[in-house]
Amino acid sequence: MISVFDIFKIGIGPSSSHTVGPMKAGKQFTDDLIARGILHDITRVVVDVYGSLSLTGKGHHTDIAIIMGLAGNLPDTVDIDSIPGFIQDVNTHGRLLLANGEHEVEFPVDHCMNFHADNLSLHENGMRITALVGDKAVYSQTYYSIGGGFIVDEDHFGQTNGSAVEVPYPYKNAADLQRHCQETGLSLSGLMMKNELALHSKEELEQHFANVWEVMRSGIERGITTEGVLPGKLRVPRRAAALRRMLVSTDKTTTDPMAVVDWINMFALVLNEENAAGGRVVTAPTNGACGIVPAVLAYYDKFIREVNANSLARYMLVASAIGSLYKMNASISGAEVGCQGEVGVACSMAAAGLAELLGASPAQVCIAAEIGMEHNLGLTCDPVGGQVQVPCIERNAIASVKAVNAARMALRRTSEPRVCLDKVIETMYETGKDMNAKYRETSRGGLAMKIVTCD
């Protein structure tokens, strides 16, 4: 089963597939060198990056992420403030300390970090890392970053994801989940909690939920006090801090009901600005869509009822259940299915989680998730300049409001829906596979070709 620990992972920006995954791959490679007993023999490491991972790699800091992974770092624990200085050192000296300083190798970046526009055979996000002794390659591994920070090596590509431990209520689709709920009388969150307890202790789960929510809230608090311009050639100004000041100073929520929308926008904008700046965020289910699930929960916390341990667990469990359906039966990779697999999935997850907190039945929860995705079908991934900024940041805000609307529509529906969640997931995947590669995180089409970056 794909666990809540798999869907919600603490990491760094700006991208789960292009930053978090590559860093994990770099770390895995040096772990393999240690396990094989050859780390201290290596004189040079060469990295080759392919497809979408290459085409938008510079804007997503893929090269930096791989280097930091080779150096022994992981996304959830890396010291973000130390990264610029470390990379400057590597660029200056052409040397790289592997595995937390265990061994130093040659690494002239211009020759050891190579970008290739063509795809490897199995996925759009491919990378190959090779260790050499002199001019002889002694170990090489190919990795694919398949979305949401998940990586898989070539030998294990296509194998079942998630834990092999038997859970009380196994499922492959939304129909299975609804059937289990109907037979047991459990809510969807209650059902998922029983599955999670087969994998983790109650204390572990509660701690994970608390850690995830703390990172989300810390991102909001950090972002609303930070202004200036985001990194990169686009020179995109941060907007969330100014928007919050405006909201706090006017406090029109009592006279203008639509002011709630402004708050939801602010919550989403601030987290995606933090992500774009390379800050600490939570994959939900990806970094490119990291603002939606927390923005909707922050809306609930501020305007409906203060979030407590119980409501936090219910929201996270349901959102991760929906995310797992897309992970199992479609994709959460923008390079594979476009932005519908990132922002669309996050919208679906958040809509379902909110519906659960608002008292929805399992069937209504799935309707909310279906609405959230149905109206993101065909959404392209065309980041300007290869950066997770335009249109990504605003898109998270729009999708957050859409998720709230989807949950409310599901709760107030009196007729049977014509489209079920499983069919919309199937449609999303087919649509993504039919989508021209220009619109799947390559920055070769759409807005990416219409907006001129600043020098």
Report each predicted region and the residues it spans:
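Accessory "access/gating" subregions that flank catalytic or transport cores
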Residues: 200-338, 446-455
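Alpha-helical support elements that line or immediately flank enzyme active sites
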Residues: 17-34, 294-306, 351-359
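An N-terminal structural lobe/cap that precedes and organizes the functional/catalytic core
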Residues: 1-13, 36
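C-terminal regulatory domains involved in ligand/effector binding and gene-expression control
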Residues: 75-253
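Hydrophobic alpha-helical bundle architecture
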Residues: 307, 318, 324-397, 409-418
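Conserved phosphate/anionic-ligand binding catalytic regions in large, soluble enzymes, centered on
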Residues: 8-26, 277-296, 337-347
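Extended hydrophobic packing segments that form well-structured cores
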Residues: 418-455
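Short alpha-helical scaffolding segments that buttress acidic/His motifs in well-ordered protein cores
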Residues: 7, 11, 264-272, 315-323, ...
